[in-house]
Amino acid sequence: MKHVLKWISDLRVAIFLLLIIALSSSLGTALPQKESAESYYEAYNSSPWLKVFSGESIIQLQLDHVYSSDWFLSLLLWLGIALVFCSWRRQLPALQFTLRWIDYCNPRQLSKLALAETIISTDASASIKRLEQLLKNQGWQVQAKSGRLAARRGIAGRVGPLMVHTGLVILMLGAVWGVLGGHRLERFLAPGREMELLNSHGKSQLNIALESFQIERDPVGRPEQYRSQLRLRELGNSRENNSGSIDKSLNREISVNHPLRYGGMTVYQADWALAAITVQLGRSPLLQLPLEQFPQLGEQVWGVVLPTQQDGSNPVLLALSSEKGPIEVFASDGSLITTLRPGGVAATINDVKVRVESILPASGLLLKRDPGVPLVYIGFAVALMGGGLSLISTRQIWAIAELEQQRFHVGGLCNREFTNFAQELPQFISEIQQI
């Protein structure tokens, strides 16, 4: 058991696990996540991903949801245990050793330190006192006894590694909590439409309505930014009005890279689509028809099949890729008949006048509730502070006075920046001799 604990707490094991987790995270970044199994079969069975993973192997290895897979969570658990044991067996004893004052009584003990000097002093006791005052003036902690002293500075540097390990463990706990307890929802909303979010008891908790949606395009027509004007209403049983909703609403605009955070939930502007097209056939009233995506025609192409006769014969396809048009009209044989524009003039198609009144875009919203985010931020902050503290060098100095031999012995240790410390110690001795 002791050998197992020693192996688990080995820093090399933790570093190896970090590399494996980083590699696994890159797989999750490169491969689309949480899509339907059919999409993986269709995309990768004939052409394996990285020429290794077919659609079936991706599903079996849980690569379709890397961050919530059993093996990825097991790696995080293993790394957390390794960091806890490493801190317990190595970092904590090192910190306790540093906090404990070491009292060297014999000059021979100082001679074995990394830095050691012996000088002739007619008043070694006075030299001890001068060194004590000099170190205190420069912020050192000093413990003086009869004929000897011990001093230290930079103890916070020993706390740094322990804080880094603690921060990483907190961060991983937050990540796991977010994966297991978080929720994710993707929805397309057309302007004027709304959706209700339910709580764990199945009751309405929040109403989200899309007031307006705007797509900003460059001169070529490519989308650059999407903006949604949202109205949020809390729903509940207290402070209710006649409609059953609380008199508390919030209007906010979201766009790409500018999400809305509300009540522990984050609403992202994730995508856009075309929801419906409003047409007029002859002298008919305006008809709003839902649009479907046609991936066989292009990546972002929507359309609707429109019959031009009362018996449903002679259908045509209205295809478009922008809310501003144009709308291309194709015959059943795939030939292009004509092109229409929203709000433009009507065109005669198979003896029927067809006019496009407008096109209704839809906003793609991504709603995420991640309860582990505060822990992730706290863990990252603790680890960052620990990393900064780790850069502080811990320095220790001991001095012993031999009154009869008129000798003054000084020695020191340093865990980093040894060259600077090797220059600092002789300066202390020189200042003592000049006083």
Curated annotation (Swiss-Prot):
Pfam families: ResB (PF05140). GO terms for biological process: cytochrome complex assembly. The keyword Flavoprotein does not apply. InterPro entries: Cyt_c_bgen_Ccs1/CcsB/ResB (IPR023494), ResB-like_domain (IPR007816). The chain crosses the membrane at residues 11-31, 69-89, 159-179. It is a multi-pass membrane protein. One of its GO terms (cellular component) is organellar chromatophore thylakoid membrane. The keyword Thylakoid applies. Keywords: Cytochrome c-type biogenesis, Membrane, Organellar chromatophore, Plastid, Thylakoid, Transmembrane, Transmembrane helix. It is found in: Plastid, Organellar chromatophore thylakoid membrane. Belongs to the Ccs1/CcsB family. PANTHER family: CYTOCHROME C BIOGENESIS PROTEIN CCS1, CHLOROPLASTIC (PTHR31566:SF0). May interact with CcsA. Required during biogenesis of c-type cytochromes (cytochrome c6 and cytochrome f) at the step of heme attachment. This is Cytochrome c biogenesis protein CcsB.
